[in-house]
């Protein structure tokens, strides 16, 4: 556990070494995540755990009318409420303290689990308390084995694929998952893994992608090619994904 209370507002701020979120996340990864989720969505309600400033939530709002969000950063919630209005019910709480009095047909946790001091504890709450009997849980994390990270290892910038860099630590990262360790924690939380995949083959760092996206060098067809290649090689993707159902409770 952390020795000092965590400041979630501070953790979500950009630093000199690393932005908390990049245009690559918003403009490339979010649409491809939605595409990866679509065939597994259940009709009904959606719970987003860690909504940040509401950018991804806006995409869910085009698909769902019943959305609840839980977010620990008060500053992020203020911005999210400005963006979303009445389209989502946003609760200011940590996951450990969240009191949700219902279950949800879809639960989404994207690029959040790696921030948690007790990831398995949250996954147990998802399985035992919040996920409906026939619901789906969508779990996405940055991938330790993404080629961009492996290249950074070969360059001597980080020690090993699953390292947590100082800049990532400033942003609240506690670990870096690969498909095997992500599934390990999902199973430890009691969940049944229905589907495993990767999202978007990625050989460049996020800041490099942002610079490319500001030019006309990268076409939509190239982005589509990276997405399709990622379906063939999930372990070499930017993000890894599990779709889970409720296990024994």
Language-model regions: role of each:
Residues 65, 132-135:
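A short helix->loop->beta-strand "cap" motif at the edges of active sites that frequently abuts
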Residues 3-8, 16-28, 55, 117-129, ...:
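S-adenosyl-L-methionine-dependent methyltransferase catalytic module, highlighting the catalytic core
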Residues 84, 130-133:
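A generic alpha-to-beta junction signature in SAM-dependent methyltransferases
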Residues 111-115:
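Short catalytic micro-motifs in class I SAM-dependent methyltransferases
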Residues 1-110, 123, 198, 223-225, ...:
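Conserved N-terminal segment of class I S-adenosyl-L-methionine
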């Amino acid at each position: 556990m952390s020795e000092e209370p965590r400041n979630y507002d501070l953790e979500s701020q950009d630093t000199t070494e690393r932005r908390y979120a990049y245009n690559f996340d918003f403009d490339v990864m979010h649409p491809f995540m939605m595409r990866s989720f679509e065939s597994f969505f259940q009709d009904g309600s959606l719970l987003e755990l860690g909504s940040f400033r509401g950018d991804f939530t806006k995409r869910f709002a085009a698909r769902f009318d019943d959305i609840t969000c839980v977010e620990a950063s008060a500053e992020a919630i203020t911005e999210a409420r400005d963006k979303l209005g009445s389209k989502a019910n946003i609760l200011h709480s940590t996951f450990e303290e969240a009191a949700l009095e219902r279950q949800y047909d879809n639960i989404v946790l994207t690029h959040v689990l790696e921030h948690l001091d007790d990831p398995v504890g949250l996954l147990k709450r998802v399985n035992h308390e919040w996920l409906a009997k026939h619901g789906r849980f969508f779990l996405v994390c940055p991938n330790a084995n993404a080629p961009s990270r492996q290249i950074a290892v070969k360059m001597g910038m980080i020690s090993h694929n699953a390292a947590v860099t100082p800049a990532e630590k400033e942003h609240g990262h506690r670990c870096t998952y690969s498909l095997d360790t992500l599934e390990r924690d999902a199973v430890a939380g009691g969940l049944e893994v229905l589907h495993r995949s990767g999202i978007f083959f990625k050989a460049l760092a996020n800041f490099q992608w942002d610079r490319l996206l500001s030019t006309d060098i990268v076409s939509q067809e190239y982005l589509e090619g990276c997405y399709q290649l990622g379906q063939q090689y999930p372990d070499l993707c930017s993000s890894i994904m599990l779709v889970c159902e409720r296990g024994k409770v």
